[in-house]
Amino acid sequence: MKSVSYTHLNKSENYNLSVDKKEDFYYLDCKDEAIGAILKKLPHASLEVEPCHVTENKVQVNIPENLDASVAKSGMWEEYDSRCIACGRCNFVCPTCTCFTMQDLFYSENGKVGERKRVWASCMVDGFTDVAGGGSYRRKNGERMRFKVLHKVWDYKERNGYHMCVGCGRCDDICPEYISFSNCINKLGKAMEEVSQS
């Protein structure tokens, strides 16, 4: 199985102030004149400073090149039925999640007036896929996790040519159940092997 590894680095020259702590000292690189004027008034040693940048991600994510819709049939998603609590925190910190829902608000002062609002929502919370008549497309948390993961790394790429996930790791950091989106993506290779053998 061949896989593609994605490493996003944050090296940039586009900053006003860089602050790096090394041992007990702070090293500043200032490009902003206003901030520089304030810093010059403080007692400090003037050094040539090269800001520290991330040069390698601690977690490598490998997305199988042969990834397709059949991975949805893998048993790996059942793990998330019990682990995920459907809080939606992973979605709300994600810079690429843009799901929304509509809410109709009625005012008690005047029953003839109301408001329809577009509200940020989460595909991971209960009720997001509810439809008229009491139906719901994804009732189990594992089904929601499957949808989110495949939307980020498979279906979005099929439509747009690149993965939706930017690799920031915010979802890993915020999850109260310590579910790692990165680890989930890394399990896709074995999941593809599983479904190809069945």
Task: Describe the residue ranges of each PLM region.
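Internal helical hairpin/lid segments
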Residues: 89-105
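Ferredoxin-type iron-sulfur electron-transfer modules in oxidoreductases and energy-metabolism complexes
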Residues: 62-82, 100-198
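Long, compositionally biased charged/polar accessory segments in the mid-to-C-terminal portions
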Residues: 21-32
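A short mid-domain helix/strand-loop element embedded in enzyme catalytic domains
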Residues: 43-74
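Extended amphipathic alpha-helical segments enriched in small hydrophobics
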Residues: 81-91
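Conserved small/polar residues in nucleotide/adenosyl-binding loops
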Residues: 7-8
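Non-catalytic interaction/assembly regions
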Residues: 16-19
